[in-house]
Amino acid sequence: MEREDIIKFIAAHKAKFEQEFGLKRIGLFGSYARGEMREESDIDIVVEIEKPDLFHLIGIKQAIEEVLGTKVDIVRLRDTMNQTLRSRIERDVIYV
């Protein structure tokens, strides 16, 4: 799996995610975004959604995992999150 494959998938499904889950913004961060992925790496996704809902996060996560066949970690970007994690995300993120 290459970074470009993930970005293409997200771009192709972004409108669906916006409509179905209230997605405002989505991006790739972590090892795939940095080009440092290994065979055992998971896909790290950051999202901003209109009305935060656990089921929406799970829906986005499952949609990506089912097609790409790789474990996905999904993080909702918010003002009150751990600032160290937020800084790491903002350093690496590639918004689609």
What do these predicted regions represent?
Residues 1-25, 34-39, 50-96:
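Catalytic core of pol beta-like nucleotidyltransferases
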Residues 28:
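Conserved histidines in hydrophobic membrane contexts and catalytic metal-binding motifs
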Residues 31:
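P-loop (Walker A) phosphate-binding loop of NTP-binding proteins
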